[in-house]
């Protein structure tokens, strides 16, 4: 009888831990939190440019080839530009940053530069 009570107690504790773990996971950022205009660093000195992320997945920028597409991946917005560059905008502590990846690299490679990113205007 004691074995049955111990097994039931262990199962109850495991079930409670599993339920607690599922409810305490952070939810991914909604795409709406990234839609809008972003002022980001170019990665050269203090130069900046603007990235615009639209609700339909279209992305434009004020530097280089202006066209691209973006999607959410976890908690970051990933942008693939027609010129081969890739950018990721993500929360880093209490601010946002833009990580840039040169043509031929993927988002799993180390970025070529990381600069600040500030949303200047929601759409």
Short names for language-model regions:
Residues 24-39, 50-56:
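N-terminal helix-cap/turn-to-beta initiation motif at the start of protein domains
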Residues 23-26, 74, 102-123:
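Edge beta-strand at a domain terminus
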Residues 88-95:
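Extended Gly/Ser/Thr-rich low-complexity repeat segments
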Residues 12-21:
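Hydrophobic h-region of N-terminal signal peptides that target proteins for export
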Residues 40-87, 101:
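N-terminal glycine/threonine-rich, aromatic-flanked beta-hairpin/loop signature
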Residues 36, 97-98:
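Conserved glycine-centered beta-strand/turn positions repeated across beta-sheet architectures
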Residues 1-10:
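Bacterial N-terminal signal peptides that target proteins for export
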